[in-house]
Amino acid sequence: MGSSPAPFADIGKKAKDLLNKDYIFDHKFTLTMLSATGTEFVATGLKKDDFFFGDISTLYKGQNTIVDLKIDSHSSVSTKVTLKNLLPSAKAVISFKIPDHKSGKLDVQYVHPHATLNSSIGLNPTPLLDLSATIGSQNVCLGGEVSFDTASSSLTKYNAGIGFNNQGVSAALILEDKGESLRATYVHTVNPTTSFGAELIRRFSNYNNSFTVGSSHSVDQFTVVKTRFSNSGKAGMVVQREWRPKSHITFSAEYDSKAVTSSPKLGLALALKP
């Protein structure tokens, strides 16, 4: 629903995407093809250092069902089945990986005009249970998440946060790492082509502060340039060019001023969708 609050995992997502999305310092190739029946086929290859990884996936979308099947270069088969409108305002996702018989998981999401609930449980004898909830609206929401390990009967994660989105401004304040750190994010969309963002993290255990600032600017309708700088001395840049509809090439670079003997990190990603 358009007026419903975002899931807890999406609080602060705009800043995360601005500061991290498309910064790939490897070599990646993606080919997406769509059949006449609407089935999508995607082949992905990734070269990381001297290693190569790849996978082939098939995505089928029905009226109330989505089936995603993926086979990777390690001979693993991953399957995800999404059932929409299982109940009013609810959907369920069943996922598992072969040959890992303990990888099965069931996710359920319920969306209300003033609340969003997410739950996840492993389909094994000692599952990990994840619960998250947000209340409010599309503009202002408050929420939290917990993870419970049934094997050790202990809480492995608990976080809380608040998010704000309105008129080109997105801000979030999240208490995470079991209360050990506080993360604040801010994104300002100056105009349809330019955005600025920042992230500040305060770690209470060692009184350490870290921050990152970044920007995104559309040079023209086909080219986007992103930059980011952190207090650790790292500076990064992304240039993405759409050279045909839904196909783009991305160049990434990062320089660490504190590692003067190391070469800058460089990355290249090519995505094709005929």
UniProtKB/Swiss-Prot annotation:
Q: Which residues carry this modification: Phosphoserine?
A: 76
| CDD domains named in the record | Porin3_VDAC
The UniProt keywords, alphabetically, are:
Acetylation, Cell membrane, Growth regulation, Ion transport, Membrane, Mitochondrion, Mitochondrion outer membrane, Phosphoprotein, Porin, Transmembrane, Transmembrane beta strand, Transport
Task: Indicate the principal place this protein occupies in or around the cell.
Answer: membrane
According to its UniProt record, in which tissues is this protein expressed? Widely expressed.
Q: Which GO terms describe its cellular component?
A: mitochondrial outer membrane; mitochondrion; plasma membrane; plastid; pore complex
Q: Where in the cell is it found?
A: Cell membrane; Mitochondrion outer membrane
- NAD in keyword set: no
- Induction of synthesis: By the bacterial pathogen P.syringae pv. tomato.
Please list the GO biological process terms of this entry: response to bacterium
State the deletion phenotype: Dwarf plants with lesion mimic phenotype and increased expression of the pathogenesis-related genes PR1, PR2 and PR5. Delayed flowering, impaired development of anthers and short siliques with sterile seeds.
Q: Which residues carry this modification: N-acetylglycine?
A: 2
Q: Which InterPro entries does this one have?
A: Porin_dom_sf (IPR023614), Porin_Euk (IPR001925), Porin_Euk/Tom40 (IPR027246)
GO MF entries: porin activity; voltage-gated monoatomic anion channel activity
Role played:
Forms a channel through the mitochondrial outer membrane that allows diffusion of small hydrophilic molecules. The channel adopts an open conformation at low or zero membrane potential and a closed conformation at potentials above 30-40 mV. The open state has a weak anion selectivity whereas the closed state is cation-selective. Involved in plant growth and development at the vegetative and reproductive stages. Is important for leaf and pollen development and mitochondrial membrane potential steady state. May be involved in disease resistance.
Comment field on protein domains:
Consists mainly of membrane-spanning sided beta-sheets.
Per the similarity annotation, which family is this?
Belongs to the eukaryotic mitochondrial porin (TC 1.B.8.1) family.
Q: What is this protein called?
A: Mitochondrial outer membrane protein porin 4
Q: Name the source organism.
A: Arabidopsis thaliana
